[in-house]
């Protein structure tokens, strides 16, 4: 099979699977992306430019990695599947823009949730400068990875992540929609979020049961007035404990007295019958402040 054909093509992917007697591992959430326009869409969404430093999570057989390298990026990749280093080293282009593969690509065999980026990098990328993070995330571990990266000390300019469409819709959801909830608020209180593209299940091998979407997260220029994120997240979760109930009803666990709960809601300029999904991010921030002041 000629390596002039992109890894992302169905023919080349199938040839790689056959050559290495491999299969997609369900326990690792593996589905190989075989849609070159979709992969180029990820690269475009991440705004990859020559010389960019990229951390890739879960390179798989290299479908996305190859396009990142061809776009001019230097890539540090995290992978847990021990069967993949041989495939990546053999199948990725051995020369990119006149440079050896080893000078443009480094593979770290480790769960990214256990990453020590400085030690793992070992001078490969210049971590004194910003990096871009790109990933085709396993569905089962999407949320932990997002929050692990947000809370890390890593200086990144963007996270461009492919994930289950349903999760993507929750990340970008607005108030008064059924997708809006604690995950929407937790992420939007920390990052700008936008939906870049949708990817059909037919773009994968084997075909998953659900469609995917690409989301781009970038640091907020102006962060909300939240001093204690752990408390803020707890308040939001309590407010959505019973989604169909009113905010006043859900606040029972935090404030026993009915009159006091209703006064608190009125102090926010809201009707006592308001439901949690009707509150904006700023109103949740104000609510958390009122509850924190009440504890003081």
From Swiss-Prot:
PROSITE patterns: RRNA_A_DIMETH, SAM_RNA_A_N6_MT. Keywords: Cytoplasm, Methyltransferase, RNA-binding, rRNA processing, S-adenosyl-L-methionine, Transferase. It is found in: Cytoplasm. It comes from the Bacteria. One of its GO terms (molecular function) is 16S rRNA (adenine(1518)-N(6)/adenine(1519)-N(6))-dimethyltransferase activity. Pfam families: RrnaAD. One of its GO terms (cellular component) is cytosol. InterPro entries: KsgA/Erm, rRNA_Ade_diMease-like_C, rRNA_Ade_Mease_Trfase_CS, rRNA_Ade_methylase_Trfase_N, rRNA_adenine_dimethylase, SAM-dependent_MTases_sf. Gene3D superfamilies: Ribosomal RNA adenine dimethylase-like, domain 2, Vaccinia Virus protein VP39. The keyword rRNA processing applies. Its EC number is 2.1.1.182. The keyword S-adenosyl-L-methionine applies. It catalyses: adenosine(1518)/adenosine(1519) in 16S rRNA + 4 S-adenosyl-L-methionine = N(6)-dimethyladenosine(1518)/N(6)-dimethyladenosine(1519) in 16S rRNA + 4 S-adenosyl-L-homocysteine + 4 H(+). S-adenosyl-L-methionine binds at residues 31, 33, 58, 79, 111, 136. Specifically dimethylates two adjacent adenosines (A1518 and A1519) in the loop of a conserved hairpin near the 3'-end of 16S rRNA in the 30S particle. May play a critical role in biogenesis of 30S subunits. Belongs to the class I-like SAM-binding methyltransferase superfamily. rRNA adenine N(6)-methyltransferase family. RsmA subfamily. PANTHER family: DIMETHYLADENOSINE TRANSFERASE, DIMETHYLADENOSINE TRANSFERASE-RELATED. HAMAP family: 16SrRNA_methyltr_A (MF_00607). This is Ribosomal RNA small subunit methyltransferase A.
